[in-house]
């Protein structure tokens, strides 16, 4: 970025904003890049401003018990704010003085006042000077206030971010990420745009007093009649505003419903296409859109009346002001025109400026209070460390994630003390639940010496991660002692990648040591992965490391922890996403050898790792089940150890199954604790009345607001083999979605009834721990792509201790002053739809011809405008050519037909004309505005429908290129613009344009010479606008792109908050945040400056125009005072309206860019059109000159497919047309009714093949089903032949019936029959409404297993003959897994089944096998052939998979399989029971 020329600019350059000319010139000629933008002035840097405000806020906190943020802001910015306010006031005062001079000029034409005729020219010069002074005062004042608002926003941005990095985990669990984003976006943006109008809270009243004083001098008491109308109008606007708030809340709920299901559909578009649900989803979303539009129209009509009231009030304000005075005294034309000018200014002050200023102050003060409350929230407490202590000691440690029991009792009592009942007694009431204190950790004792390794294992949710958080200081101990040095390194369970290069992620601000770095990279098996990248370890990773596999992210996260030289290393399940071989290599080379001299705490569930640990801690329900060595475990807990060691392949099980086994084993062998009581009754959905209460973790008080506290009711264990931790404790830091369950919502409010229909928010702590909400789906997505198997060979490291090379200090990375725009662009990449710098005429044409009525309404608007102009010219003609006969009262009539005095006797004639014209124009304006707003909203409806259809029918390659968030932005942000802003902005622009053009026409009609000055003025305006828009739209685009890194960095920091605190890298991340802020500031500041450059020059052009008009009017004296008054009044009206019209035109062009983006999505080519094109190409290649006649009988009968036979010939599959082939020239066949197992390593193409069957990808070759080729029928017909269970479970917001049958094809009896068949009937029956019960938030009230059963039921209902299953048992508990196997055997007995599974034992049910390796397919007719030593499968399977399959084959033949859960002890009905 270049240095800003503002700092060296002269006073004249700053006054006229000439320093922005180079950037405007470059933007007009070339496309602007980030490097072209000037740096923000040094006074606007985030470091400087945040330090300034932070210093004042600390001073405020130190000096007062109740600190006020507004006082800190006042001390920082008040004097400049006052200075620009005075400039703004002086500029506004000139508007009040202008009508006085206008009256004097008109009076100079009075035949009886010839003395002032000679000074008319001087009065004209004075009037023009007032316009010049106003222009020179107003624009610097507005820019200065915008500048101060920007600085306040930057300072508070930084203050909020710094506070966020200090928040305690308890606070993070109480606030949502949406609240933080709201603080940094919606609210704070009001400072930038609103501060310029804030001064009108005092300027407008002073302006009104001054104007009323001047009007009193003209009209006496009559002046207050017009003011009274304006006050009534303001009250009317306030009433409409209240009504709009009511509709806004209702409408917001409807919009939320639509966006929720739209988001769900976009995130699960693969499932939607696989189920052929495009039309069904389109109908559901459009029905919600219809309900939303009803509210939108009502709200728009109210906003229309509020906005148009300003325009419509002009006639009547003047009329009511003049009428009483005229009836009594008569009036001269000078007073009429002066009154009109005064009323224009008065109307703006009363109806626009003052209400807006009041609203701005109200919003700003409320927002400052919100930020103030946020800044006073609890911060996490840094533990007191002993730097000389290198081990770890914990003595009788107990901890709660929530506030302590006694502390909460005191809070509730305190709240009740403040609220008295009518008889003066205090009441503290509790629920009748059996409340038991539930600490997350209880009486933990540890003593680990330097160099020892502690392995922590235990049941799901037992507190393993919580123990690490306790050591880090994130969890505060309520009892006990913790001792360690404080030099800690941490690797989180969920891999966290910050935006930056691979090297920066590993070094993470620690001083670079090449030997240590290379050793760590080698030990973490990253060498081979890094060499595959073009930039190697300088490769820039995007948000969350989206370009990496899950395994690569896990290894980088581990390398970061290992690279840091610390005394204590906390490794929270670092191997969860790695295959067995890679895990073994990293554990040996890194944890056991490289870190041999360090104290390590490893969370793991593998027996081999437990054996090699110096000590073992087994946790169960927050308590220590066992602490000691592995040999002590065998002697002290023989039942437990022998049970686990009885599993020959325990370490080869998935992490989920190992956790399930541990949980079940601990549950069976744990010693009964007297302090823990359990209800052995089996849980059932029939206890719906207790459902909400059992999962609420609060004290219920009848008089106090409810607080979240650390006590819950113990609930019974479920029948399944996994832990019941979700019911036993309020918060599990283990991401439960990985264990096959979805946590229930945690609400801040306690309700007496069930919580089924309610939505939950995702807290920041949920975001950090990836607890299920919207994040659970992303976790499942992640796990589907993370099983990357490293092929790196074992590495023998040197015995030298890399940590002996201790550096002088762990300093942060040097961050240069220059911003690396390219790195930022790559790190914070966001899908931006490329659109032209200026909205093209084609976009306007497409938009206004979108709806037949819209073009007709525009023509109608023009006709109404012509009628209004004609009516105005007619009135002027009457007043000019038909003098009123005043007879009795001696109306003065000069020989040259001057109409000077209107008396009471002649008043009624003028009154009827004026009122008649006013009523006509008012009615016409209403008829013009309402149809326009109505049809524009209809156009928005059409655009939404077309865009939705286009997205739902777009090929999958489109969704691979575009992010889901970018697509959702079109349906949220852009559709909101089309609904809310564009209709009224277009109405305002058209109305203002007609006012300006109409005034110019009338002025030119009265004085033709003025028309000669109008033409060049309009031409210059049009050219200047086009010149400015080229640059301004590019700056707005850059500003929008620059805003994304700010919020991305906030979310990224929150996700890795525990990591960056453990590494003490808060300052480093604050610096990165300030970099992003400075980048955005540079773009936004340039936009503000160039906008002011443009508006000032527009004012200058029309100041010149007014000068010309004034002197032409004064010098051509033959027309008299009436004509001069009309010309000057209208010219002044042009000046006051023009700036508004210009802003509206710019806003319209800016908002039309949303229309351009929507059209881009509408123009996306659909799957059907692409397939039709491919089919034509295939036919033309086969017979280029032949006549192609479609055979309607290719689809042989309505029962197709009848058998399910599949034949694949020479199939080649690509993700993109010009990409590499994933599968190439593969051929095989599947007989009807066969069960085929699809095997291969991760990334070999198993899911790709299933997608090719569904025609989701670019395919060439032949696929036949029962003799019918894929290219002989439509996509929908082809896909309906398949029943699909995808990797990612899709439950959308809707009823059970809609989720099972969204097309409404089946009767209830058939749905119930299938539900019973798959084991869902007893589940659905427990919910209120049963099939009509509404599932929300991805069906969070259902377990993962039940969601999978829903997908199974859909396939059964589809009556398909070919079933495709892509890892259906992923993350399932053993019970649900057994149910799915049973349904597959029974419900799909006569179907062809293609099963892709990572659970090798699932393959025992298959009759044939297909193995994919290196893009080729090998067929095996039996399991024995598959396991043959000569089989190519030996090269495709990892050794762990071979062990599983071998064990499964022999155990199934020779002995009963080890029971993980008591499946045989449960009846068939119990299998179908649910645990939520």
From Swiss-Prot:
Example of a GO MF term: bicarbonate transmembrane transporter activity
Which EC number(s) are documented for this chain? 5.6.1.6
Residues with covalent lipid (S-palmitoyl cysteine) sit at 524, 1391
Residues modified as Phosphothreonine are 715
Reactions catalysed according to its record: ATP + H2O + closed Cl(-) channel = ADP + phosphate + open Cl(-) channel; chloride(in) = chloride(out); hydrogencarbonate(in) = hydrogencarbonate(out); ATP + H2O = ADP + phosphate + H(+)
Q: Which residues does the UniProt record annotate as the domain ABC transmembrane type-1? A: 81-365, 854-1153
Q: Print the keywords alphabetically.
A: ATP-binding, Cell membrane, Chloride, Chloride channel, Endoplasmic reticulum, Endosome, Glycoprotein, Ion channel, Ion transport, Isomerase, Lipoprotein, Membrane, Nucleotide-binding, Nucleus, Palmitate, Phosphoprotein, Repeat, Transmembrane, Transmembrane helix, Transport, Ubl conjugation
Where is there biased composition of kind Basic residues?
Answer: 1445-1456
Motif PDZ-binding is found at 1474-1476
Cytoplasmic side of membrane: 1-77, 147-195, 244-298, 359-853, 935-985, 1030-1090, 1147-1476
Q: Which stretches of sequence are listed as region Disordered R region?
A: 654-826
Q: Where is this region: Interaction with GORASP2?
A: 1382-1476
Name the segments for region: Disordered: 1445-1476
Q: Which residues cross the membrane?
A: 78-98, 123-146, 196-216, 223-243, 299-319, 340-358, 854-874, 914-934, 986-1006, 1009-1029, 1091-1111, 1126-1146
Q: How does it sit in the membrane?
A: Multi-pass membrane protein
The record's account of tissue expression is: Detected in epithelial cells in nasopharynx, submandibular gland, pancreas and ileum (at protein level). Expressed in the epididymis. In the caput section of the epididymis, expressed uniformly on both the luminal and basolateral sides of the ducts and on sperm in the caput lumen (at protein level). In the cauda, detected along the luminal border but not continuously and is also expressed on the basolateral surface. Within the caudal lumen, detected on sperm.
Q: Which residues bind ATP 1?
A: 401, 458-465, 493
**Bias (Acidic residues):** 1466-1476
What residues bind ATP 2, as annotated?
1215, 1240-1247
Broad class of enzyme this protein falls into? isomerase
Function, in words: Epithelial ion channel that plays an important role in the regulation of epithelial ion and water transport and fluid homeostasis. Mediates the transport of chloride ions across the cell membrane. Possesses an intrinsic ATPase activity and utilizes ATP to gate its channel; the passive flow of anions through the channel is gated by cycles of ATP binding and hydrolysis by the ATP-binding domains. The ion channel is also permeable to HCO(3)(-); selectivity depends on the extracellular chloride concentration.
Q: What is this protein called?
A: Cystic fibrosis transmembrane conductance regulator
Which species is this record about?
Answer: Rattus norvegicus (Rat)
Q: Which gene encodes it?
A: Cftr
């Amino acid at each position: 970025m270049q240095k800003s020329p503002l700092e060296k600019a002269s006073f004249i350059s700053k006054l006229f904003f000439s320093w922005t000319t180079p950037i405007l010139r470059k933007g007009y000629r070339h496309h602007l890049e980030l490097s072209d933008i000037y740096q923000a002035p040094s006074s606007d840097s985030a470091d400087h401003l945040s330090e300034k405000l932070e210093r004042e806020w600390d001073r405020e906190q130190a000096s007062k018990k109740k600190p006020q943020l507004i006082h800190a802001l006042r001390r920082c910015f008040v004097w400049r704010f006052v200075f620009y306010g005075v400039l703004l006031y002086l500029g506004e005062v000139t508007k009040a003085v202008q009508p006085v001079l206008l009256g004097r000029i008109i009076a100079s034409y009075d035949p009886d006042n010839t003395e002032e005729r000679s000074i008319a020219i001087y009065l004209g010069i004075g009037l023009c000077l007032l316009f010049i002074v106003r222009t020179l005062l107003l624009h610097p004042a507005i820019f200065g206030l915008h500048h101060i608002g920007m600085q306040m926003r930057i300072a508070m941005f930084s203050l909020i971010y710094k506070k966020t990095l200090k928040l305690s985990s308890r606070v993070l669990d109480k606030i949502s990420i949406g609240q933080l984003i709201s603080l940094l976006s919606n609210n704070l943006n009001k400072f930038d745009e609103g501060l310029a109008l804030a001064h009108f809270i005092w300027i407008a009243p002073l302006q009104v007093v001054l104007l009323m004083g001047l009007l009193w001098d003209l009209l006496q008491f009559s002046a207050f009649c017009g003011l009274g109308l304006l006050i009534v109008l303001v009250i009317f606007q306030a009433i409409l505003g209240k009504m709009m708030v009511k509709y806004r809340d209702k409408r917001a709920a409807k919009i939320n419903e639509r966006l929720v299901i739209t988001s769900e559909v976009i995130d699960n578009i693969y499932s939607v296409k696989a189920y052929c649900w495009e039309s069904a989803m389109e109908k559901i979303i459009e029905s919600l859109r219809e309900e939303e539009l009803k509210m939108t129209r009502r709200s728009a009509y109210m906003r229309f009346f509020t906005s148009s009231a300003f325009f419509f009030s002009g006639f009547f304000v003047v009329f009511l002001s003049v009428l009483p005075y005229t009836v009594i005294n008569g009036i001269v034309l000078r007073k009429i025109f002066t009154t009109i000018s005064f009323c224009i200014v008065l109307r703006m002050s009363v109806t626009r400026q003052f209400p807006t200023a009041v609203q701005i102050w109200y919003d700003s003060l409320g927002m400052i209070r919100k930020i103030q409350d946020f800044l006073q929230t609890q911060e996490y407490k840094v533990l007191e460390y002993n730097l000389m202590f290198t081990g770890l000691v914990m003595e009788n440690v107990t901890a709660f994630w929530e506030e302590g029991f006694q502390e909460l009792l005191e809070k509730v009592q305190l709240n009740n003390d403040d609220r008295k009942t009518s008889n003066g007694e205090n009441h503290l009431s509790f629920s009748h639940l059996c409340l038991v204190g539930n600490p997350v950790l209880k009486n933990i004792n540890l003593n680990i010496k330097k160099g020892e390794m502690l392995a922590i294992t235990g049941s799901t949710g037992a507190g393993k991660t919580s123990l690490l958080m306790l050591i880090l200081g994130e969890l505060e101990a309520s009892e006990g002692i913790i001792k360690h040095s404080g030099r800690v390194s941490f690797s989180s369970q969920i891999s966290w990648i910050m935006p930056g290069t691979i090297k920066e992620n590993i070094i993470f601000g620690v001083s670079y040591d090449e030997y240590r770095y290379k050793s760590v990279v080698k030990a973490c098996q990253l060498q081979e992965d890094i060499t595959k990248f073009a930039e190697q370890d300088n490769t820039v990773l995007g948000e969350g490391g989206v370009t990496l596999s899950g395994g690569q992210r896990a290894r980088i996260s581990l390398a970061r922890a290992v690279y840091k030289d610390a005394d204590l290393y906390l490794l929270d399940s670092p191997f969860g996403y790695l295959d067995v071989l890679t895990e073994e290599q990293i554990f040996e080379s890194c944890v056991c050898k490289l870190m041999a001299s360090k104290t390590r705490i490893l969370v793991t569930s593998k027996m081999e790792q437990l054996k090699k640990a110096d000590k073992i801690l087994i946790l169960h329900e927050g308590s220590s089940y066992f602490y000691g060595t592995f040999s002590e475990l065998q002697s002290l807990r023989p039942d437990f150890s022998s049970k686990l060691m009885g599993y020959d392949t325990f370490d080869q099980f998935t992490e989920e199954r190992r956790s399930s086994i541990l949980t079940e084993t601990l549950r069976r062998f744990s010693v009964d604790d007297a302090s823990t009581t359990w209800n052995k009754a089996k849980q059932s959905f029939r206890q719906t009345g207790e459902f909400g209460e059992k999962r609420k973790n609060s004290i219920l008080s009848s008089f106090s607001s409810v607080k979240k506290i650390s006590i819950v009711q113990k609930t019974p264990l479920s029948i399944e083999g996994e832990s019941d931790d979700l019911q036993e404790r309020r918060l599990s830091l283990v991401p439960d979605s990985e264990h096959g369950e979805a946590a229930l919502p945690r609400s801040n409010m306690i309700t007496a009834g069930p919580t089924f229909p309610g939505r939950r928010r995702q807290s920041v702590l949920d975001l950090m721990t990836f607890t299920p909400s919207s994040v659970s789906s992303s976790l499942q997505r992640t796990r589907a792509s993370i099983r990357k198997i490293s092929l790196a060979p074992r590495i023998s490291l040197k015995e030298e201790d890399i940590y002996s090379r201790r550096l002088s200090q762990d300093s942060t990375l040097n961050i240069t002053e220059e911003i690396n725009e390219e790195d930022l662009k790559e790190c914070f990449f966001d899908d931006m739809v490329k659109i032209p710098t200026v909205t093209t005429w084609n976009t306007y044409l497409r938009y206004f011809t979108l709806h037949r009525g819209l073009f007709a309404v525009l023509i109608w608007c023009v006709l109404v405008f012509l009628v209004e102009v004609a009516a105005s010219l007619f009135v002027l003609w009457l007043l000019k050519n038909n003098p009123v006969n005043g007879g009795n009262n001696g109306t003065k009539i000069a020989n040259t037909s001057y109409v000077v005095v209107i008396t009471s006797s002649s008043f009624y004639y003028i009154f009827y004309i004026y009122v008649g014209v006013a009523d006509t124009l008012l009615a016409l304006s209403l008829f013009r505005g309402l149809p326009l707003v109505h049809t524009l909203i209809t156009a928005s409806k059409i655009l939404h429908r077309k865009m939705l259809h286009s997205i739902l029918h777009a090929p999958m390659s489109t969704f691979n290129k575009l992010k889901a968030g970018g697509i959702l932005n079109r349906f949220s942000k852009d559709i909101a613009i089309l609904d809310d802003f564009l209709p009224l902005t277009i109405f305002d622009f058209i109305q203002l344009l007609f006012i300006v053009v109409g005034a110019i026409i009338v002025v030119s009609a009265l004085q033709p010479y003025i028309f000669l000055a109008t033409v060049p003025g309009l031409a210059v305006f049009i050219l200047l606008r086009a010149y400015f828009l080229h640059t301004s739209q590019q700056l707005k685009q850059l500003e929008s792109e620059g805003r994304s890194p700010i919020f991305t960095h906030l979310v990224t920091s929150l996700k890795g908050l525990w990591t960056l605190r453990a590494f003490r890298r808060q300052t480093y991340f604050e610096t990165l945040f300030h970099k992003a802020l400075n980048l955005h500031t540079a773009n936004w500041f340039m936009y503000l400056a160039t906008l002011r450059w443009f508006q000032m020059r527009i004012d200058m052009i029309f100041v010149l125009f007014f000068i010309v008009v004034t002197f032409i009017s004064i010098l051509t004296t033959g027309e008299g005072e009436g004509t001069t008054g009309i010309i000057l009044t209208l010219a002044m009206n042009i000046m006051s309206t023009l700036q508004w019209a210009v802003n509206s035109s710019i806003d319209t062009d800016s908002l039309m860019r949303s229309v351009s983006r929507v059209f881009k999505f509408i123009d996306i080519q659909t799957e059907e059109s692409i397939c039709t094109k491919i089919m034509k190409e295939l036919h033309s290649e086969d017979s280029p000159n032949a006549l192609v006649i479609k055979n309607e009988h290719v689809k042989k009968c309505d029962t197709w497919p009848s058998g399910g036979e599949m034949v694949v010939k020479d199939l080649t599959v690509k993700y993109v047309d010009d990409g590499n082939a994933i599968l190439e020239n593969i051929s095989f066949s599947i007989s009807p009714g066969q069960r085929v197992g699809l095997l291969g390593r991760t990334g070999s193409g198993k899911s790709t093949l299933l997608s090719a069957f569904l025609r989701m990808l670019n395919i060439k070759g032949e696929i036949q089903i029962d003799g019918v080729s894929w290219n002989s029928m439509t996509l929908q017909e082809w896909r309906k032949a398949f029943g699909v269970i995808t990797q990612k479970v899709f439950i959308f917001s809707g009823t059970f019936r809609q989720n099972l049958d969204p097309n409404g094809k089946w009767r209830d009896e058939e749905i119930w029959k299938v539900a019973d068949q798959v084991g869902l009937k007893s589940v659905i029956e427990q919910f209120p409404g049963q099939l009509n019960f509404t599932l929300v938030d991805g069906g969070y009230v259902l377990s993962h297993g039940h969601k999978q059963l829903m997908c199974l039921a859909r396939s059964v209902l589809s009556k398909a003959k070919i079933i495709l299953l892509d890892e259906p048992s992923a993350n399932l508990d053993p019970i649900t897994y057994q149910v799915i196997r049973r349904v597959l055997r029974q419900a799909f007995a006569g179907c062809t089944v293609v099963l892709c599974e990572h659970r090798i034992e699932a393959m025992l049910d298959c009759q044939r096998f297909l193995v994919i390796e290196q893009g080729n397919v090998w067929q095996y007719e039996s399991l024995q052939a598959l396991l043959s030593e000569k089989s190519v499968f030996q090269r495709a399977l990892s050794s762990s998979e071979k062990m599983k399959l071998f064990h499964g084959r022999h155990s199934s033949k020779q002995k009963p399989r080890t029971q993980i859960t008591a499946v045989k002890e449960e009846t068939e009905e119990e299998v179908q029971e649910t645990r939520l």
